Amino acid sequence: MIYLDDAATSKPLPSVINELLHYLDDKWGNPSSPTSISYLPDGMIGCARAEIADYIGANPYEIFFTSGGSESNCWAIQGYINHQTRINRIPYIVASTIEHHSINACLENLNARFDYTPVDRFGRIDLNELELRIHDLSSYYSGCCPLVTIQLANNEIGTVQDIRSISSIVHRYNGILHVDAVQAFGKMHINVRELGIDMMSVSGHKFGCPKGIGFLYIRDGIKISPLIYGSQQRGMRGGTENVPYIAAMRKAVSLLRKDTAYDIRMNVLRNNCIARLREMGFTINGDPNHHLPNIISATLHQDIMADNLIYMMDTCGVYISAGAACNSSSIHPSHVLKAICMDDVDAYRTIRISLPFDISMDEIDMAMDLMKQQIQILLSEKA
């Protein structure tokens, strides 16, 4: 098996699984209980907060554990809307045209005004257009405190946004910046203070944790309402804490600290993969200068649909995708590819390769050899 779909989900790391099982088997107390069996789980949660906060340049009390990226995204948006409504302000949200489906679905199903700001053909946000939208709504809605929600790195094409500049624009108009860092976390350095991030969503299963754990960073002073009510986590996120999964995420973050050569290693592998893809007639999508090192979006300019190539590769034990896993069953072309001005035909011919941290050069070469063979087979069937 050669797994090249890491952006969909990463394989849980052995040491992370061991940590999870340890807390399932031996330290299973309820952290909210006054009994002695609960002391260790409660203490571990505090240590996990401190470890994560230190990794992103935050304070421990600014970290709130959730079930994952989608919950964190929805909480940031709905919590903002509910709080603004409660204090008699008009909630207004600006997002880019290439956001994750959890953001788009949230905007389209909640009672709030929102607008989309465009991206260029590389998937980079037009900063002038963004400022124009924020300026216009701030002028029209007096006292408006807009929420701008932006992916740090896109999950389909890997483009990384200039969050520092976006933050400067947002704060110039007294807005709040929420960043979806689900794909970026663990793949690039993130310091929320340096970047000027007010809220940030993260999901554990993108960096070696099991599915079902994540967190929302909320900068001290940012006011949003809870999404799930209860007494836990200072009343901000109810529900008994998922102790084993929090322990697993703490372990995964500690491992990220140790992998100091990730960028160098992954860029070498990425460049080799891209060279092989270009030899087969693919063009590469996304920003050539500002991108994650592990995501490659590639369009084949031959009469082969991505779904057919994905199926053929699957039968060979090589796993790739056509884009976001959360939208893999859609019959419509990717909204991300449409946003970067790709036509429907090319969108249906686009694949995504995302490299796990432990992939080898030999595995990439083997996968590319198999892909070349499968493309030739598919073309011969059409002849």
What are these regions (language model features)?
Residues 1-383:
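Pyridoxal 5′-phosphate
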